[in-house]
Curated annotation (Swiss-Prot):
Function: This is one of the proteins that binds to the 5S RNA in the ribosome where it forms part of the central protuberance.
Organism, as annotated: Nitrosospira multiformis (strain ATCC 25196 / NCIMB 11849 / C 71)
Similarity remark: Belongs to the bacterial ribosomal protein bL25 family. CTC subfamily.
Gene3D superfamilies named in the record: Ribosomal protein L25, beta domain, Ribosomal Protein L25, Chain P
A Gene Ontology term for the protein's cellular component: cytosolic large ribosomal subunit
GO MF assignments: 5S rRNA binding; structural constituent of ribosome
Region Disordered: start-end pairs: 1-21, 198-228
Keywords carried by this UniProt record: Ribonucleoprotein, Ribosomal protein, RNA-binding, rRNA-binding
Name assigned to this protein: Large ribosomal subunit protein bL25
Keyword set includes Ribonucleoprotein: yes
This protein's encoding gene: rplY
InterPro entries documented for this protein: Rbsml_bL25/Gln-tRNA_synth_N (IPR020056), Ribosomal_bL25/Gln-tRNA_synth (IPR011035), Ribosomal_bL25_b-dom (IPR020057), Ribosomal_bL25_C (IPR037121), Ribosomal_bL25_long (IPR001021), Ribosomal_bL25_short (IPR020055), Ribosomal_L25_dom (IPR029751), Ribosomal_uL5_bac-type (IPR020930)
Oligomeric and partner information: Part of the 50S ribosomal subunit; part of the 5S rRNA/L5/L18/L25 subcomplex. Contacts the 5S rRNA. Binds to the 5S rRNA independently of L5 and L18.
Biased composition range(s): Basic and acidic residues: 1-13, 210-228
Top-level division of the source organism's lineage: Bacteria
Amino acid sequence: MQIEISAEKRELQGKGASRRLRGSGKVPGIIYGGENPAQPIELDHNNLYHQLKLEAFHASILTMSVEGQKEKVLLRDIQMHPFKPQVLHIDFQRVASNKKIHMKVPLHFINEDIAPGVKLAGGLVSHVLTELDVSCLPKDLPEFISVDVGELAAGNTIHLSNLQLPEGVEIPALMKGEDLPVATIAIPRGVAAEEAAGGVAAGDIPTSVQKKEGVAKEGEKKDAGKKK
């Protein structure tokens, strides 16, 4: 998904200038990194606010157009108002096509409804991670990574080493030997309690006990016959 952002160079800086800028419906921001100096910018608040709702905006290479000059950037930081739907400041980082980047990518969980642990055991899929830090060249950056839980049984766990990664994408945590859990299927307490209560069948009772009960019942039948 190609996303383009339009911005203008920001001449005035400082708290007062930023406050006036926000009052006029603009958002102060900055582009940094690479061989060029940092460039203060200003963006239209409404357009930016709607773009921020796109998942791909947070995990994709973006095309930044500053007064007609375009360059590739990544979203690096957003400052939001504590209780109003307002963007206070935004940071972008330039990217070079030949240098690896580190980026958090969202995880999309698929086939949850057909997982044996859900369909047969009544379990619930627990998302231990919802995003993943990856390393790759800009051209290889995925918008998301799919996690297939279609064969996951109750009590089992999917780890980082089980993920199917796009070509050219690496997981720094795995390279450090950290095979973190990604998703698991847990049995709710109510379901587990019902299974435990209903699990004591005749086959679960020791044979010696079953025999004693059988003898006792047979004796009761004979006594009843004599009384008649």
